Amino acid sequence: MARTENDTWDLASSVGATATMVAAARALATNADEPAIDDPFAAPLVRAVGVDFFTKLVDDNFDLTALDPEAAEGLTRFANGMAARTRFFDDFFLDAARAGVRQFVILASGLDARAYRLPWPAGSVVFEIDQPDVIEFKTKALADLGALPTTDRRAVAVDLRFDWPAALTEAGFDPAEPTAWIAEGLLGYLPPEAQDRLLDQIAELSAPGSRVAVEEIPAIEEEDHEEIAARMKDFSDRWRAHGFDLDFTELVFLGDRADVSSYLQGHGWKTTSMTSDELLVHNGLPRVDDDAQIGSVVYVTATR
């Protein structure tokens, strides 16, 4: 079903299902012969959501070789990409903590379990923002598992399209303190103008010493829209063939959008960036062939 202006979702539908898909990839990466990450909560959370296809993927008896070679290769690529992405944002938060930051915000937190698995320093506060149904589900699922946060975790149940800064402040966020923000797997699901608004809101809430890390899907030229849409459809068809029906072309916004690095630089931030291929190589993982990529993902880090 196509996106609408104020659409909502749970973790088994629409944009929410992509969070479950990514958690399944983290579980696969965690269980790899040479794991690049360790997320012990990924598989249990996927099982709690209960989407049959993803539950099978995280089963201890799942045999990747039982899939056709093309599907197995694609799944391995996806798990590697999510492992590298996870490491990037983990390292970003840990680097910020070592620099003295004690206030952390996860935008569109989905099934992110960093508040439960990272070694946070004393005095840290981690704010998780997502839609109410998503926040409620994950909080209960982790409680049912007996999991306890390793820091002061504060769940902020609000849609990022609404007045989330007010909800964040009400939860105890202090805009006078340096903050580390992450927007992981988020911007592509926002219209271009909503992306700009989100970056503006982050800037308004960021004291000197703050930093932000963003996964950016660069603007796709209009003449390339059909090709990218075709690749997304092919990706969706492959998932559908194995029992998961989600049309990615209906979830993302392909319109022209601001370059994140340039936008942040224009608002007083100093930025560095790394491509997805560079990130894979940095983590000792194989890069992706150009023909297998859907757009060029860039990981941006900014400080002020």
UniProtKB/Swiss-Prot annotation:
Taken from the record, one Pfam family name reads LCM
The signal peptide here is: none
As recorded in UniProt, its EC number(s) are 2.1.1.-
Q: Which GO terms describe its molecular function?
A: methyltransferase activity
* Positions with a binding annotation for S-adenosyl-L-methionine: D130, D159, L160
Q: Which UniProt keyword terms apply here?
A: Methyltransferase, S-adenosyl-L-methionine, Transferase
* InterPro entries listed in its UniProt record: Ppm1/Ppm2/Tcmp (IPR007213), SAM-dependent_MTases_sf (IPR029063), SAM_mthyl_Trfase_ML2640-like (IPR011610)
The EC class name is transferase
One GO term under biological process is: methylation
> What is its biological role?
Exhibits S-adenosyl-L-methionine-dependent methyltransferase activity.
Q: Which family does it belong to?
A: Belongs to the UPF0677 family.
Q: Which PANTHER family match?
A: S-ADENOSYL-L-METHIONINE-DEPENDENT METHYLTRANSFERASE YKTD-RELATED (PTHR43619), S-ADENOSYL-L-METHIONINE-DEPENDENT METHYLTRANSFERASES SUPERFAMILY PROTEIN (PTHR43619:SF2)
Question: What name goes with this protein?
Answer: Putative S-adenosyl-L-methionine-dependent methyltransferase MSMEG_1482/MSMEI_1446
Protein's organism = Mycolicibacterium smegmatis (strain ATCC 700084 / mc(2)155) (Mycobacterium smegmatis)
